[in-house]
UniProtKB/Swiss-Prot annotation:
BP GO terms, sorted: 3,4-dihydroxybenzoate catabolic process; antibiotic biosynthetic process
EC number: 4.3.99.5
Quaternary structure and partners: Homotetramer.
Gene: creD
Superkingdom to which the source organism belongs: Bacteria
Reaction(s) catalysed by this chain's protein: 2-nitrobutanedioate = fumarate + nitrite + H(+)
Its biological purpose: Part of a gene cluster involved in the biosynthesis of cremeomycin, a light-sensitive o-diazoquinone with antibacterial and antiproliferative effects. Catalyzes the formation of nitrous acid from nitrosuccinic acid (2-nitrobutanedioate) by elimination of its nitro group.
Gene3D superfamilies: Fumarase/aspartase (C-terminal domain), Fumarase/aspartase (Central domain), Fumarase/aspartase (N-terminal domain)
Name used for this protein in its record: Nitrosuccinate lyase
Amino acid sequence: MTRPPAPPPGAPGADELLDCGLLSPVRAGTPVEALVCDSAWLQAMLDAEAALTRAQARTGFLPAAAAEAITAAARADRIDLLAVARGARETANPVVGLVAALTAAVRRDDPAAAEYVHRGSTSQDVLDTGAMLVARRALRLIGDDLDRAADALAALAADHRDTPMAGRTLALHAVPTTFGLKAAGWLELVSEAAGRVARLRDGLPFSLGGAAGTLAGYFGDRTDRGDPAVLLDRLLDAYAAETGLARPVLPWHVLRTPVADLAAVLAFTAGALGKIAVDVQSLARTEVAEVAEPAVEGRGASSAMPHKRNPVLSTLIRSAALQVPALATGLTQCLVSEDERSAGAWHAEWQPLRECLRLTGGAARTAVELAAGLEVDAARMRANLDLTDGRIVSESVAVALTPLLGRQAAKELLTRAAFTAGHEGRTLGEVLGELPELDGVLPKERWEALLDPARATGVAGALVDGALARRRPPAR
């Protein structure tokens, strides 16, 4: 292999190229970074190479001693990561340089084994399988964090099952609801995301297709020694066992369903967490002040305003939720891959996939802290219910009056009464009490119940109970 040209004088070294999250604080310092960084991808590709040799040894395609030597050498700390990365500029993918470096490392230990490195394989098999290994490791972490966030949200929903608050539609007070129901909605989203992550993680496939999807290089003339279908089954089953990945129906070099599935699940997960974040931001506004993020000394400080306590956690999560769907769109566009290997579409997946994984991983880790430490001000929620002087119960009053006045008449009466109350600065109850058509239609106790926002939350409590029951494991 021709050595790539040396970097020009003044080119940055590895330390200067460190991507530590300066412009992406949602994932900076979180565990997912270590699982998707360059060295993690390098190790995953080496793991794919080593697993392949072991699978080939198990099926008699190469000596067991060679597989052992290759596995022993397949360590990222024995490979010059920066050289592999820069060498990829000459080959359009990092596997060519990786194979050369791995072969050299094996040759130093066992010259005979070096002949079996990358036997029959192709760059895309190695990189795609490595990508699935990276994704599986990251998804396991993301799934664990989603489960922890869901536990915290379930506790919030249970604790505030009957805590009344204003439901808001199109940014305005609509009808009373409960904070428990809002938290249950968050719980449902996170639980659904966790389920999707788990199902996807367990079904991620390895890639094995050879140069153009026929696996010809893996078998050579071996097809003369037995049924090709049997040989294929043995190799695929062995590789599945060695990688822990699922066996695909066909080589998927240009059938990019696994990547599209990752894009969809990660976009949904980030969006689900983003819904929580934007709700917290809305409820934490100074004018609303119904919730607050966990109080940590020094967090949320402004560079200019000493009094500020900014909603940092929800801001970080929301930033990821706005990025991942856009990146996922780029990944799904790569479904349009020409021929048996794309010139550019496959290559366009790598960085967006890494970003989707680490942004979602950072958001999931941040969501655990947000959900577990969220401060809820039930008294403020109750006070905010009274901001419209009772008009927030207009729907429930209209429903109660419908059997007596008719649906249209009841709605028109409440519309006029609410308008009068708002413009005259009076309560809805006062205005309704002066209407002659309502004189004596309902007993006083019934009016008091109808005009109490805390008693107009519908079946919110039952809905919360249902969400919590779905979260709990079935009794055995």
